[in-house]
């Protein structure tokens, strides 16, 4: 089940919230949320709900063991068992294919469908076990409460990767107020708008230019396709995170921010402080720092982290290349850290955007031969020409969409919202400002929901990009 479906919006979510808020006690609310989360996950792939239950049970049990007996070998077994499920379900086919290619064998390639969200909930559950071992958090005695942490449907499938330490107190006790619900609804509607009104539409153009045959492709068409995919992946993934955070607010939870205007960055280092924050902080805290961090073997540590980051995104060599591409860029920035601040900010920003654009082209093409050909066209080395009438027409027709996406990636929407809030706050003494702000927000939410509903009713299904990770 996905957030951007009419069934979720008008059947599942309303009934879930109704049952949730009808419960007078927190235990009842937690039970409803667990039940709803299991139904949510099992909707498309019922059998894999048992895998999620097993991963939750594994880490719950190891948490109790590690609290009583903090042995490294116990933690190593826990990590190995968690990673084994990822290897079997996500990487088995990739490993066998490469063994066959390397050793000229003919082993049968496993055809295992990827459980949705396995990378997210496995990392989330594993972080709990490591935190218990480190004494950062007390082990949870109740399997039901731990299952709620792992399976909570707002962030189950595509994050943010929530740390147990951040929600442990909220599982035991949380407050509900109208303002939080109000803000949660707005955040959810913003995310829905990002996904349905922007990501899905630019994604169609990106697939048209990058996903089909390269016959007739031009340099400009490849640049336009990469730009559209750059917009798509941001609005798709940040839109999901907005919806997850919004639903969390409605239910009384506070999830971490996962995106902070990443395309406003002036360096790749800054970009990764703003993009998919829950993943980058996971690798920082559970891989980079334990390896030695900035204290020793810095570049080796970065190499390991970015190789793993690439593999986390998918079992394909292009994802490994994507991770290593960022490894190289981050190393270069470390080496030039004294010189880079001397370059004008606008130049650094434009160079950063160009480098990010290149990265998304690597990310998009899982077939390495197509990736190579795309870059030949991208840099005008294929003899295909700079543009043609088809590309020009596509560009002209999508200029308004490109403009809206560019503004949406900037600080303009946030700044505008803050200004409106401040103007309304000036009238807060007599209560008028608050009412005006509430009315404007309500109209804004309703408009986004209506437009998204119309779009969903007239279009085919578009899954979130990060569901496959």
Enumerate the language-model features and the residues they cover.
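Membrane-embedded transmembrane alpha-helical bundles that form the catalytic cores
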Residues: 1-468
């Amino acid at each position: 089940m996905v957030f951007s479906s009419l069934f979720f919006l008008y059947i599942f979510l309303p009934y879930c919230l109704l049952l949730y808020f009808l419960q007078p006690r927190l235990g009842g609310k937690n039970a409803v949320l667990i039940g709803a989360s299991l139904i949510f996950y099992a909707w498309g792939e019922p059998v894999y709900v048992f895998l999620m239950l097993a991963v939750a049970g594994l880490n719950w049990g190891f948490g109790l063991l590690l609290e009583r007996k903090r042995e490294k070998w116990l933690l190593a077994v826990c990590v190995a068992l968690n990673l084994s499920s990822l290897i079997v379900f996500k990487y088995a086919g990739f490993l066998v294919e490469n063994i066959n290619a390397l050793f000229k064998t003919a082993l049968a390639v496993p055809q295992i469908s990827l459980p949705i969200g396995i990378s997210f909930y496995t990392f989330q559950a594993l972080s709990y076990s490591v935190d218990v071992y480190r004494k950062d958090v007390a082990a949870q005695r109740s399997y039901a409460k731990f299952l709620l942490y792992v399976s909570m449907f707002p962030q189950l499938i595509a994050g943010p990767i929530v740390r147990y330490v951040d929600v442990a107190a909220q599982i035991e006790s949380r407050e509900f107020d109208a303002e939080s619900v109000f803000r949660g609804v707005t955040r959810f509607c913003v995310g829905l708008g990002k996904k349905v009104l922007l990501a899905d539409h630019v994604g169609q153009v990106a697939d048209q230019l990058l996903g089909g045959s390269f016959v007739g492709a031009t340099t400009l068409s490849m640049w336009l396709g990469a730009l559209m995919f750059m917009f798509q992946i941001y609005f798709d993934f940040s839109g999901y995170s907005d919806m997850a955070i919004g639903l969390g607010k409605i239910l009384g939870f506070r999830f971490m921010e996962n995106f902070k205007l990443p395309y406003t960055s002036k360096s790749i280092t800054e970009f990764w402080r703003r993009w998919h924050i829950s993943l980058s902080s996971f690798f920082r805290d559970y891989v980079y720092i334990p390896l030695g961090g900035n204290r020793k073997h810095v570049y080796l540590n970065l190499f390991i982290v970015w190789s793993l980051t690439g593999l986390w995104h998918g079992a394909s060599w292009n994802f490994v290349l994507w991770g290593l591409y960022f490894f190289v860029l981050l190393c270069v920035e470390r080496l030039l850290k004294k010189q880079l601040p001397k370059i004008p900010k606008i130049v650094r920003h434009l160079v950063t955007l160009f480098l990010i654009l290149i990265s998304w082209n690597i990310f998009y093409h899982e077939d390495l031969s197509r990736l190579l050909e795309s870059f030949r066209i991208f840099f005008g080395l294929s003899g295909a020409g700079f543009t043609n009438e088809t590309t020009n027409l596509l560009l002209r027709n999508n200029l308004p969409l490109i403009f809206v996406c560019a503004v949406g990636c900037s600080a303009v929407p946030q700044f505008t919202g803050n200004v409106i809030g401040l103007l309304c706050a000036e009238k807060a003494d007599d209560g008028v400002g608050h009412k005006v702000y509430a009315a404007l927000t309500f109209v804004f939410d309703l408009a986004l929901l209506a437009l998204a509903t119309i779009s969903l009713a007239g279009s085919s299904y578009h899954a979130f990009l990060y569901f496959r990770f």
